[in-house]
């Protein structure tokens, strides 16, 4: 199977988000890469489902709370930018202050 670099990146994000979901389900607080992966995957899947950029920018802020992440992680992530594939093409989605 041949994958483009972009497809490899998407798979890596998806795999990291699965790991983050499992750790979160066990009650563990997420670290920086896990938090970014989980939010990014939620945005990518929402785009695939046909949600708008505005919806995803808003919903991206509800994926995690400060209680879900290790101390100081929320401050390390001021924005998350994700290139997501929508039904009408690829768009950049920016989630500002993703962990409230």
From Swiss-Prot:
CDD domains: Urease_gamma. This is Urease subunit gamma. It is found in: Cytoplasm. InterPro entries: Urease_gamma, Urease_gamma/gamma-beta_su, Urease_gamma_sf, Urease_subunit. It is an enzyme of class 3 (hydrolase). The lineage of its organism: Bacteria, Pseudomonadati, Pseudomonadota, Betaproteobacteria, Burkholderiales. Belongs to the urease gamma subunit family. It comes from Polaromonas naphthalenivorans (strain CJ2). One of its GO terms (cellular component) is cytoplasm. Heterotrimer of UreA (gamma), UreB (beta) and UreC (alpha) subunits. Three heterotrimers associate to form the active enzyme. It catalyses: urea + 2 H2O + H(+) = hydrogencarbonate + 2 NH4(+). Keywords: Cytoplasm, Hydrolase.
